[in-house]
């Protein structure tokens, strides 16, 4: 009977070990596939709202990227293609100063 217990016990340990390894792989994959923190889309929207107060921008011309530099440093990179057009409020301000 002890011989049978030996084979069953080692099989259970191998199954548990295999399940643990698979779970670790899944968790590691999920961590790397996440594009960034949960607050990143709202942060992007807030930054764009502030910029829109001063300059007209096309949402298609905006890229936001979060890069990790080491374990403790993250870099948020925001690229915006600005048009050569004058802001809408620029004409209003010049007319008021002329009056």
From Swiss-Prot:
Domain of life: Bacteria
Gene Ontology BP terms: cell division; regulation of division septum assembly
Entry keyword Nucleus: no
Disulfide bond residue pairs: none
Keywords (A to Z) from UniProt: Cell cycle, Cell division
Family: Belongs to the MinE family.
Role, per record: Prevents the cell division inhibition by proteins MinC and MinD at internal division sites while permitting inhibition at polar sites. This ensures cell division at the proper site by restricting the formation of a division septum at the midpoint of the long axis of the cell.
Protein name: Cell division topological specificity factor
Organism: Tolumonas auensis (strain DSM 9187 / NBRC 110442 / TA 4)
Gene: minE
């Amino acid at each position: 009977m002890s011989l049978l217990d030996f084979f069953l016990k080692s099989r259970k340990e191998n199954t548990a070990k295999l399940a643990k390894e698979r779970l670790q792989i899944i968790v590691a994959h999920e961590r790397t596939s996440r594009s960034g923190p949960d607050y990143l889309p709202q942060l992007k929207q807030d930054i764009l709202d502030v910029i829109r107060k001063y300059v007209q921008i096309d949402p298609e011309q905006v890229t936001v990227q979060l890069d990790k530099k080491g374990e403790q440093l993250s870099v948020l990179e925001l690229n915006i293609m600005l048009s050569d057009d004058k802001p809408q409020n620029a004409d209003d301000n010049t007319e008021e100063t002329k009056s």
